[in-house]
From Swiss-Prot:
InterPro entries: EHR_sf, ERH. Belongs to the E(R) family. It comes from the Eukaryota. This is Enhancer of rudimentary homolog. SUPFAM superfamilies: ERH-like. It holds the Pfam family ER. PROSITE patterns: ER. One of its GO terms (molecular function) is identical protein binding. It comes from Caenorhabditis elegans. May have a role in the cell cycle. Keywords: Cell cycle. Homodimer. PANTHER family: ENHANCER OF RUDIMENTARY ERH, ENHANCER OF RUDIMENTARY HOMOLOG.
Length: 103
């Protein structure tokens, strides 16, 4: 896996822009899920356990002003940009693999 940079802008306000870097793409995808889980905790602070459907996570991603991943290509040593659709497909594959490995 390759070094990955997450670019995030939740609202129209450019001051809401942030970035995070991760050792690999899987860690970045898990980071995106944690951002959503933190959002849910703030939305419903009295709820002890957070559960959600992946479709709600995808709606959250769609509602963000911008979300992009830059993934290092180890052959060219350049970062390849990926959009929200790629992120959602990658999260789906990650969750599906984890579900299949539990059985």
């Amino acid at each position: 896996m390759s070094h990955t940079i997450l670019l995030l802008q939740p609202t129209d306000n450019i001051e809401s822009r942030s970035w995070s870097d991760y050792e690999n793409t899987t860690e970045c995808l898990e980071g995106i899920c944690r951002v959503y889980e933190e959002y849910l905790k703030k939305k419903v602070p009295a709820q002890n356990e957070i559960t959600y459907d992946i479709s709600h996570l995808f709606e959250f991603i769609d509602d963000l002003k911008d979300l992009s991943m830059l993934v290092l290509d180890n052959t060219t040593y350049t970062y390849v940009p990926h959009n929200k659709q790629y992120v959602k497909e990658s999260i789906y594959k990650l969750m599906n693999n984890r579900l299949n490995n539990q059985h």
